[in-house]
Amino acid sequence: GSLAAAVAAMPAMAQEGDVRVIRAAVVGCGGRGVGGGYKPKSEQDYYRMGALGNLIQAAAELAKQGIKVKVQPVAFADYFLEKAKAAAEKFGAPAANAFGGANGYKQAIDRPDVDVVILTTPLNFRPRHTMFAVQHGKHVFAEKGVAVDAPGVREMIAASKLAAEKKLSIVCGTQRRHQRGYLLVKKALDEGKLGTILGGAVYWNGDVPWVAGRNKDESNASYLCKNWLNFTELSGDHICEQHVHNIDVANWFIGRYPKTVVAVGTRARRVSGNQYDGFSGDFDYGEGVHIHSMCRQVNACANNVSEFFRTDKAILTGTSAKSLDKKWIPLEGDFIDLNPYVVEHMDLLKSILGKGPYLNEGEACAMSTACGVMLRIAAYTGQMVAM
């Protein structure tokens, strides 16, 4: 049948003795993909090497558990060819396997020696790159958020459904879903021990991460790709690029998506791009449940990155629970207590190898990104926006 044909078309994974070799391509060779220009001084330094470094670390952790697997980086793509070449050199791949330009991702992904693709470009490109990877039989790590607008969300959901048909794994960069503290709270909620969520608030209030200047005579395309973090067209605004983490926790814990949102937003302090400084919105999840969503990128202000929920039995953060009389509620569960940026890749590798649950987070992350898009549009326009 079609499933058998899809499996037959997938590249066979390499072996080194009894060790499975997972061959990886990276599309987007900046800080999130490969740790930027940072070079490791020891194996313990791989945590500073972006998603690819985390994938390599994850394989090493699984080896300690008796799952014999290693990661081999084989191809790199970036809009800026010099970034792809630098990443290839850093990770020991041939210079010929580094590709630049807007279509370099095709050359990096569509190779018989690639099993998994790490997608860490600006958000605008995530749906197209994910769909291309899935169409070519590759497993995917897609950094959050995964779109900047409704058409991108729909394409990401379609790619996720195609991946499910092909039994291809997708893990997104919503690492809180792989973090022990959050998993303990989610488990207790699902078991009814913490009651039903009645409302809450989620926050990402922090500084402007960075701004890239424009060179003389630099093209719009080059400048946008370089300074993407500050342009809504590339990033979806910081509510999609950053605050999506916290919105995703609300969706995950509540177990459904909001029906509508109204919001306000401001821009007064940004020195680059076209994004807002901050957003504040009210997500209506139905059944009387409202979540306040607040995010801000303004330096030298009171910062807060957290989640808060009130149930009929407890007061919750993302990782803890207290009774209404403010006594700690013990949380129990057998979840690994390691860096969640590594654990998400451990879970991806186990899904690929059939050593753990099959994971396909594409649609869930697309829907959380859609919530960010909704709130952004509500703030930009002053209108109520429905899912």
Positions of the model-derived regions?
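A structured beta-alpha segment of the ubiquitous adenosine-cofactor-binding alpha/beta core
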Residues: F91-L119
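C-terminal helical cap and adjacent loop that interface with cofactors, partners, or active-site loops
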Residues: G35, N54, E241, H245-P258, ...
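Glycine-centered tight beta-turn/hairpin loop motif at sheet-sheet or coil-to-beta transitions
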Residues: G286-H290, K313-A314
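N-terminal Rossmann-like dinucleotide-binding module
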Residues: L3-F91, A250
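Beta-strand-loop-alpha-helix segment that lines the small-molecule cofactor/substrate pocket
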Residues: P122-L123, P127-H178, G192
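Short, solvent-exposed loop/turn and secondary-structure capping segments
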Residues: G35-P40, L55, A86-K90, R128-F132, ...
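Predominantly a Rossmann-like dinucleotide-binding segment in NAD(P)-dependent oxidoreductases
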Residues: G28-G36, Y47-G50, A164-C172, R176-G273, ...
